[in-house]
């Protein structure tokens, strides 16, 4: 029996963020900007053309800022470390053909790290995670720091954010309908819950294939 894709929340989030219009819309809400041209946004990829979104991450550059977004359905204190790896991997491509040993300063995009949380465990509306929290030896003045902002996007949390950001709001409507039919309607098979006839279910063949895999 096919029990459906247990990672459906991450997979749908990734597909949404692969769309430049969606990614730009979310960026505008989080940063208070009004960019309207999706072509101003550049999706960042790993070597061999493998998009970071395939790994449940979204990474893109807008106006010299590199945003790295990740969805989490469980609490993960290692996000700063993971984002450090993502950021350095992407930056290595930016500077590949530049002389970092020369006298001229090589400019790199401003990093922005965001985690969208929608798990079952109760969490604050917003909070921060720092790379220095993972250091084996605590220091008051870390010489390397990375800060992730976490948004709890479950309904009942961050209402103002969800009202402004229709992409995230509609995504959470879909997730909540799957939860509803999976639990309350006693649909033990996750695939049936995902494909149940709810108003906000995903309809495209590509997304259905992802949900079922």
Put a short name on every predicted segment:
Residues 1-213:
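Elongated, amphipathic alpha-helical interaction scaffolds
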């Amino acid at each position: 029996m096919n029990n459906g894709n247990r990672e459906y929340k991450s997979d749908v989030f990734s597909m949404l963020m692969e769309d430049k219009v969606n990614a730009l819309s979310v960026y505008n809400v989080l940063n208070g900007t009004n960019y309207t041209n999706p072509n101003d946004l550049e999706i960042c990829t790993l070597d061999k053309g493998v998009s970071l979104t395939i790994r449940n991450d979204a990474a893109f550059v807008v106006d010299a800022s590199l945003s790295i977004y990740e969805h989490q359905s469980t609490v993960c204190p290692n996000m700063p470390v993971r984002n450090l790896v993502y950021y350095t991997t992407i930056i290595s491509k930016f500077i590949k053909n530049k002389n970092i040993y020369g006298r001229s300063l090589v400019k790199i995009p401003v990093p922005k790290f965001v985690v969208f949380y929608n798990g079952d465990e109760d969490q604050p509306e917003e909070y921060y995670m720092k790379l220095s929290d993972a250091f084996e030896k605590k220091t008051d003045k870390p010489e390397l720091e990375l800060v992730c902002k976490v948004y709890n996007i479950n309904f009942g949390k961050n209402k103002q954010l969800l009202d402004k950001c229709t992409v995230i709001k509609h995504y959470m409507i879909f997730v909540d309908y799957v939860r509803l039919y999976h639990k309350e309607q006693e649909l033990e098979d996750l695939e049936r819950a995902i494909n149940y006839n709810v108003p906000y279910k995903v309809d495209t063949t590509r997304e259905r294939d992802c949900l079922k895999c």
